[in-house]
Curated annotation (Swiss-Prot):
Membrane topology: Multi-pass membrane protein
Function (record text): May have a structural role to stabilize the lipid body during desiccation of the seed by preventing coalescence of the oil. Probably interacts with both lipid and phospholipid moieties of lipid bodies. May also provide recognition signals for specific lipase anchorage in lipolysis during seedling growth.
The protein, known as: Oleosin Cor a 12
Tissues expressed in: Expressed in seeds.
Organism: Corylus avellana
GO cellular component: membrane; monolayer-surrounded lipid storage body
Residue intervals passing through the bilayer: 45-65, 70-90, 92-112
Coiled-coil positions: none
Region (Disordered), start-end ranges: 1-24
The keyword S-adenosyl-L-methionine is annotated on this UniProt entry: no
């Protein structure tokens, strides 16, 4: 590998380093007719909307200039009134939220009781059966223990 000569490849560049104006248009010439029509259609609409935005801004500034002295003069009345209105709105909203929570809780309890009352007779029957089975088991066990005691007593008498 050391005995091979190194080769340098040089690729010629087009344009020789000067700027050619960005992306080239494949067809040549200016913008297409569709683009020109789109600009001509959008120009009046954009201008109208810009004029309306300017008028709205001017009206807002004039309204603020006119009402600022009124806000300053009536601020001892307006600030407490705004606080009262804010508290009233907050109380109505919290009242509604608490009422909705109460209704949903009541609905859940009623649904739970309805489901429980439907399954209660079945559970009572199961409890009765378990008690009867347990009573029968205890009776059987008592008989067995009694017989065991009798048999041991008889064995004790014999010996």
């Amino acid at each position: 590998m050391a005995d091979r000569p190194q080769q340098l490849q040089v690729h010629p560049q087009r344009g020789h380093g000067h700027y050619e104006g960005g992306i080239k248009n494949q067809r040549g010439g200016g913008p297409s007719a569709v683009k020109v029509m789109a600009v001509l259609a959008a120009l009046p609409v954009g201008g109208t909307l810009l004029a309306l935005a300017g008028l709205t801004l001017a009206g807002s500034v004039i309204g603020l200039l006119v009402t600022s002295p009124l806000f300053i003069i009536f601020s001892p009345v307006l600030v407490p009134a705004a606080i009262v209105v804010g508290l009233a709105v907050a109380s109505f909203l919290s009242s509604g939220a608490l009422g909705l929570t109460g209704l949903s809780s009541l609905s859940w309890v009623l649904n739970y009781l309805r489901c429980a009352s439907q399954s209660l007779p079945r559970e009572m029957d199961q409890a009765k059966r378990r008690m009867q089975d347990m009573a029968a088991f205890v009776g059987q066990k008592t008989r067995e223990v009694g017989q065991e005691i009798q048999s041991r007593a008889q064995e004790g008498r014999r010996t």
